[in-house]
Amino acid sequence: MSSDITGTAAWQKLRDHHAQIQSVHLRELFEKDPARGQELTVSAGDLFIDYSKHRVDRDTIGLLLELARSVDLEARRDAMFAGEHINTSEDRAVLHTALRLPADASLVVDGQDVVADVHEVLDRMGDFTDRVRSGEWRGATGERIKTVVNIGIGGSDLGPVMVYRALRHYADAGISVRFISNVDPADLVRSLSGLDPATTLFIVASKTFSTLETLTNATAARRWLLGGLGLGNEAVAKHFVAVSTHADRVAEFGIDTANMFGFWDWVGGRYSVDSAIGLSVMAAIGKERFAEFLAGFHAVDEHFRTAPLEENAPVLLGLIGLWYSNFFGAESRAVLPYSNDLVRFPAYLQQLTMESNGKSVRADGSPVPASTGEIFWGEPGTNGQHAFYQLLHQGTRLVPSDFIGFGEPTDDLPTADGTGSMHDLLMSNFFAQTKVLAFGKTAEEIAAEGTPEDLVPHKVMPGNRPSTTILAPKLTPSVIGQLIALYEHQVFVEGVVWGIDSFDQWGVELGKTQAVELQPVLTAAEEPAAQSDSSTDSLVRWYRRQRGRA
C-alpha cells in the first residue's frame, strides 16, 4: 500500500503554512511584494499565465513543489511520456501525447512504433477529408456533401463539438458540422431538422461500435437517410463512415471498412479529440489547420515535459488547484472564457477533470485520504457576470476562477457610439473582474463615496477571491490545442499527488448495466416484478402508467 500523502512531512508543512496565510488578504500580499504581478507569471507556447492573484506567496509555491517532488512527479511524468502502463487498473499505457508527436519522432511501446501508426491514420483522415471538402466524395445520388453529422457521446462528442465551435472561423469549405450525442430522440430530431439526406455525411464514433446511445442514434439516422433517399442499404456506404476499431460491426452496419478510422486502447475518450475522433473537425477546417491544432498540443506537451517545475505552467496550476481543494476546502473551479467561441470549453473540461480525478480509491485500491476531483463549471463572459458572478464576489463559498482571454478577436464590431471596439469593451470587463475579485472594495471606501450607512454592508466587496488569468494572442487552431493540453496536464499533476489512476472510469459502468436491465421492465406488456428498492419500484410504475403500460 502506498503511503498516506496527508501524513507526509511535505503535506504537514503545507497545513502549517495554510494556517498562517489563510487570513492574509491579496491586498496585503501585493503590498508586501509589489513585483508579484510581473514575477508570478509563466508562459507555455503562446499562453501567458498570471497566477499572482492567488492566495499564495513564494513560500507557498516552494512548499507545493516540495510536495510534488515528494511523490516523484517528474518520474511519473516521464513514465507517461515513455509509454509505461501508468493506467494500472486497466494495465494500459497513457499516450494521448503521442497523438501529436511530429511524423519524424519515434516512440516504440510494447514493440510497436506508435508514431508511425498515428500518422498512418492522420494521412488517411487527410485524404478522406480532402475528398469531402473538394466535392470529390459524392453521396448516393451524386451530390456533394454539405453537412457532416458526428454521432458519438462523451469524449466522442464533447471534444469535437467544443473544438468545432471554437474554430468556426476556420471552417472554409462550405461544410457545416452538427453533433448528435444524447439518446433522447429530441437531440437527433432537432439536429437533422432541415438537412437534405442527399448532402449529409454521418461519422459514427464508437471505439467498439457497440455504445448503446451512439448505435441507437446511428440506426435512427440510417433509417432517416434511407427513407429520405428512397434507396436501399447500398446507399449507407456513401453517407456513413466510422471511427472505430471493430471492423466486423462496422461492416455489418453497412459502412465500408475502407472508411473506418481507428484509434488505440492507450487513448482515453476524454483525451481523444486529437485522434480520429476529431475527423469532423478536420472535415470542417482541413488537414493543414488540424496539423496546427496538433502542433499546439505538442508545444505544451514539450513545455510540460522539459520545463523546470518552478516554471512549468501545468505543474504550477495543478498544484494551486490542489492547494484550494485540500487546504482551503474549495469544491469547484469556475472556467470563464471571454470568448463566445469557447462556449463549450467548460463542459469539455468537466469531463476531463471529473471523469479523470473523481476517484475515492488510490491506484493500489486503498481509500484516498484527501478530497479529490475539482468540479469545473462556467460560462463565457460577459454572460456569467449577469448570472452567477454575484456568488463569486459576495458569496460564502470560495470558488477559484480561470479567466481566459485573447488579444485579438475572431469578430469585432464598433461599440454603441460607432467608434470603439466591442472586443475592447469585452476585455475591459475581463480585466475589471479579475481586479475586483482580488482586491474588492472596503466598507471605508464605500462610505467615503457618500453611500448611506445602511447600504454599506450590502455593497462591500470582500475581495481575496483567487483567479488565474490566461491570455493568448488569438483563438487559433494551435492555441485551442495549447489550452486543452494545459488542462490535461494539470489533471495529471493532481492525480499523481493524490495517488489515483486518472485514466480509468469505472464509475460510469454500473449505471450502463442497470439501464440495460431496467429497459425491459419499462416496456414489458406484463406487470413487472417488484424492484429491489421501493423508490425505483414506485418510479418505474409511475413511468409505465404515463406510457399506458400499467
Swiss-Prot record:
UniProt keywords, alphabetically: Cytoplasm, Gluconeogenesis, Glycolysis, Isomerase
Paired cysteines (S-S): none
GO biological process: gluconeogenesis; glucose 6-phosphate metabolic process; glycolytic process
GO molecular function, one term: carbohydrate derivative binding
Pathway(s) where this gene product acts: Carbohydrate biosynthesis; gluconeogenesis; Carbohydrate degradation; glycolysis; D-glyceraldehyde 3-phosphate and glycerone phosphate from D-glucose: step 2/4
Domain of life: Bacteria
UniProt keyword Cytoplasm, yes or no: yes
One matching Pfam family: PGI
Active site, UniProt feature: 355 (proton donor), 386, 512
EC numbers, comma separated: 5.3.1.9
Main location: cytoplasm
Any single Gene Ontology cellular-component annotation: cytosol
HAMAP family: G6P_isomerase (MF_00473)
Family of this protein: Belongs to the GPI family.
Name by which UniProt lists this protein: Glucose-6-phosphate isomerase
Chain's gene name: pgi
